[in-house]
Amino acid sequence: TIKSEAAGLSGNFALSELTGDLPAGAVEVKIGDKNYSFTPPVPSQGADAAYMINEISEDEFNRKNPFHFVMAGDGINEDEEGNVYLSEEAFFKIEIDTEADWQTDVYDTDQAGGDIAANFGGQAKNAVSNPENGKIGKISGNFIVNSSSAILNNNFAEINGINADFISNQAYHGGAIYNRGKIGDISGLFINNQSEGGGNAVFNLGEIVNIGGQFVDNHDAYTYEARMMPMVLDIRGGGAILNRGTIGKIDAEFNNNIFKYDRGGGAILNEGDIKEIYGKFTANEGPAGGAITNMNKIDLISAEFYANSADMGSALANGGEINEIKNSVFQNNYGSAAVLNDGTIGKIDAKFINNVNGNNNMSSAILNEGTIDSISGTFSGNRTYSYDSSAFGAVVNAGVIGNIDADFLNNSITVYDQGTANYDFSPDYGQLAGTGAAITSYGQDLTFTAEGKDNFISGNYVEFGTARDYPEKHGVFAESGSKINHNAIYMHSFSLAEFAVPSYKNKKLKLTFSTTEGGSYTINDNIDGGIVDIDNDGFAERDVEYGYNMNLTGDGTGTVYMNNEIINADTVTIDNTTLKFNKFTHNDGTVSKGGFTTGYNDGRDAVTSLVMKNKANFNLYNKYQDTVNLKGWKASGDSFLHVDV
């Protein structure tokens, strides 16, 4: 018989105040004869926001363990709008069913394919150890406070399936399950399992067909000795799962799992092969890959990522190969870019919403230093905060991106001057410091496509503020009097590696917008670009050659609406498509207008040449624009100029 004190659950659950120690992830709780799901506030709502409660069905609750959550205190309140919240006096405790049949013997022999159904608690070694070449049918029951992995499946051993709950188990690798052989489907509830070396709940060196269930509050038990000898002790990561073998599919919920050291992977660290990952990842944390770190191969990720955090890749860090990310949501992740790619990714089709980079390091949504074939979806409300010049918007590209087919709406950068009088944001410095609130590209070409659809780039801006309080995670807006620059895209002529001490390259970057099958791009925010040091004297600002060309291409049916300035472009080519200038009023009342400019207000000569070919159409909207200043002009192939008079 196990008493509740022996279960080791007093820390996060038993008799704890909700606002203090309830796990940060969503938790399902039974109160009386009803079942509820408790979802924590996301970081952007502030530290004082309340937990949201939703009633769920018995099937969703689906607890098959001999313990249950019990509400104590005054319980639930309802506000005027009908939202249900916990009262401030409410707290939880866990009751263990002491009448349950608790197993005290350790299974350490071949079960000849038979099933095991029992409750295991307090074992000093593996509760179930399947020897080499051993066979077990299905394992069910509950594993609470066992040591040295609750289930050990050895080399060439087989377990047909596991449907059990694992609470507060601990081992060096794989607190709940350590697999060297083959396991069919794994499902259940994994709470508060720990490891020192990685895979706090599941450590896989063999083959697992599917993994499902819930992984809540699994965390590393990293010791002083382990910190001193990480290479010897093989410390990796994986707050819930560390995979070095093969896994067919993972479809589960991961809440508040943590691995703070080495490769990270707050929920999953993959060093093997995973075919598919689905589910929801909430409030997981790691040094890299707040939810997932991939160092080898994943075929498909289709999941939701909320409020995960890391210094590198707040939701996902990829150093291997991911074939496709689709139908995914990255929202309210914080600390760095939601997706960090230093490997290869085929396609990304996702929504990136309100992700926050408050750690002074580059991007808020995607930082690409590898290869991405294509990006589609929506980037909205992503924010980057910085104390210096290293803040560059929703997407930063320092590698290769094949094409982008996406909307960029209301993404922003805030650069703080720390309140010092000598922190001068001159035009030259501003180009390096902020710019590209939607996308910044380092030494790499960019291509945007709109095939039979209308894409928008609007509401993106850079704010040079005077706020003194650095936003560690959630960010604050700059004080009044800050300067707003409505800039969406910035093309840097030098590479990201050269940013600290730039050596400007004689390379013309190419920015392409391709509109076909009636598709269009509407751009309401400015496009800007770096300059190159032609004479290699180290003073690029003295030269007049500019660092990017813009190509507008199509099949004769598309349109690019430029309600913004095209700054510092060398040559703009319109090829079998329409470029239409118009104007746009931003939320702060600023009016932007289509045009070509140097970006300086000192009377410099025009720097941009326009080339029209293959039935190109340049449409000037003369209600606001009566002059276009160009360095050069060429027209051929039945191209025409459209002027409203």
Give the ranges of each region predicted by the language model.
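Extracellular beta-strand/loop-rich repeat segments of large surface/secreted proteins
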Residues: T1, R468-E472, K483, Y490-E498, ...
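All-beta strand scaffolds that present successive hydrophobic residues in beta-strands
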Residues: I2-A6, E17-G20, I31, D79-E80, ...
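Glycine-rich beta-solenoid repeat tracts in large extracellular/virion proteins
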Residues: L9-D21, G32, A50, V70, ...
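Short, structured coil/turn linkers that connect adjacent secondary-structure elements
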Residues: N12, P41, N142, N146, ...
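Extended, beta-strand-rich, solvent-exposed assembly scaffolds of outer structural proteins
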Residues: A26-S44, Y51-E60
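Acidic, glycine-anchored loop motifs typical of Ca2+
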Residues: G75, G538
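Fold-core signature of tandem repeat domains
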Residues: V128, I136-I139, F143, I151-N155, ...
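Predominantly extracellular beta-rich ligand-binding scaffolds that present long acidic/polar faces
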Residues: D165, G188-F190, I258, I277-F281, ...
